[in-house]
Amino acid sequence: MSNLDFCTIYTTTGQIDQLSYAQKAADSGDTCIGMKSKHGVVLLAEKPRVSPLYILESDEKIRKIGNTIGVVCTGMSSDTFYVGCAIKDYVFHHKENFNEDPTPGMMKVYLNDIFHYFTRGINLRVLGANTLTSVYKDGSFSLLHTDCSGKTLSYKAACIGKGTRRIKTELEKLDIDTMTIEEMVDVGVKVLYMAHDPSKDKEFDIEIGIASMETGGDLRKLENHEIRPLVGKYKHISVDED
């Protein structure tokens, strides 16, 4: 008997094939990185140059949700747009009810709820998106990774999108816990270029958001002139260079 893979039905092996297909869609998305140390959180997003007429600022990858929450998504553009709006809606209602931004624990619940809804109905398509969420609460930072199944876990560094395999290997070599914001930004830009293959990948720009003690946990986007020196430093790095 062939497996039923057109909806969220279990196969004979106990799997849901649509989850695997959705994850493949997310894995083909633009590369995004999150890193967390005791000093704060850094989010980086790759932004391929789709046209010479492309306006960089028109495509916002990293979104500020509330005062102390930042989100970056990758995967199918329609799904990443929905996820960003859904997270914003959950955070808005939480703040309306409790007069504060959600804790990391509550954000896990909200992220689970958003993604799980699409894995339980036979008439729904699983979301082809992964997210990285930064949360600041009571003097500490959290970085949450959510996959297509809705599984949400805390990480000190995580990567989503097509460069995940190479970048994860590089991140595992680092002592991220003690790194400063500046060091995490520097390393993040470096590994983005290490995972880039000029022979088959488009040129890209980089969007960076930081949340630190200095910003009060508030997510701040770096300006182009702050990113440009790092791009010049690493844009010619070899894909095979260690």
Swiss-Prot record:
The keyword Nucleus applies. Its main location: cytoplasm. It comes from the Eukaryota. The 26S proteasome consists of a 20S proteasome core and two 19S regulatory subunits. The 20S proteasome core is composed of 28 subunits that are arranged in four stacked rings, resulting in a barrel-shaped structure. The two end rings are each formed by seven alpha subunits, and the two central rings are each formed by seven beta subunits. The catalytic chamber with the active sites is on the inside of the barrel. It comes from Encephalitozoon cuniculi (strain GB-M1) (Microsporidian parasite). InterPro entries: Ntn_hydrolases_N, Proteasome_alpha, Proteasome_alpha-type, Proteasome_sua/b. Belongs to the peptidase T1A family. The lineage of its organism: Eukaryota, Fungi, Fungi incertae sedis, Microsporidia, Unikaryonidae. This is Probable proteasome subunit alpha type-7. PANTHER family: PROTEASOME SUBUNIT ALPHA/BETA (PTHR11599). The keyword ATP-binding does not apply.
